[in-house]
């Protein structure tokens, strides 16, 4: 019942339970929202970033990298390491309500991220994105944040490309 309340499954009494399809429009809107909010948080955070916070970010980037290069990556640990890294600047700016809202916004976005992570082999690109964000923070390059965050968060759509409408079309609700 809880899965149905969260939109993950559809239960038809006496017939069965099916996993719900992803809503591509919602995924796109959530990425758009997170891009706008996270870029702003980073612009506010970067000038205030302390040496201790920079060291924490570096450790978290390196922790993600260590998980990503394992022979058989643990995708749940990668997901949590990614959340910890991005949560760093939200926590530093005392914007944890925003972070929590973005993380819990809709199950479709989390499921889409897992589809990307588990099927595209795009971990090297994610590592490069994290390094670029870390370097922009260290340089306090305020103009870099929006394009970097946009590239990073839209990466799944870019990596999956035509597979979204071909190989994984059945994972998504039909376009209306």
Regions picked out by a protein language model, each given a short descriptive name:
Residues 121-124:
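Active-site loop of classical SDR/Rossmann-like NAD(P)-dependent oxidoreductases
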Residues 1-47, 161-176:
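Short linear motifs at protein or domain termini
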Residues 25, 51-115, 126-139, 144-158:
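Conserved amphipathic alpha-helical segments that form helical-bundle/coiled-coil interaction surfaces
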């Amino acid at each position: 019942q809880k899965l149905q309340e969260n939109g993950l499954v559809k239960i038809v009494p006496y017939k069965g339970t099916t996993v719900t399809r992803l809503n591509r429009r919602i995924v796109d809107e959530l990425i758009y929202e997170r891009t706008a909010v996270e870029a702003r948080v980073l612009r506010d955070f970067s000038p205030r970033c302390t040496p201790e916070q920079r060291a924490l970010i570096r450790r978290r980037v390196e922790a993600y990298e260590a998980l990503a290069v394992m022979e058989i990556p643990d995708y749940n640990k990668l997901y949590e390491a990614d959340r910890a890294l991005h949560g760093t600047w939200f926590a530093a700016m005392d914007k944890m309500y925003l972070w929590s809202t973005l993380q819990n916004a809709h199950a479709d976005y989390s499921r889409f991220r897992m589809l990307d992570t588990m099927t595209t082999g795009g971990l090297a690109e994610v590592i490069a994105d994290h390094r670029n964000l870390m370097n922009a923070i260290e340089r306090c390059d305020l103009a870099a944040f929006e394009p970097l965050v946009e590239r990073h968060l839209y990466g799944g759509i870019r990596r999956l490309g035509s597979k979204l409408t071909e190989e994984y079309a059945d994972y998504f609700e039909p376009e209306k």
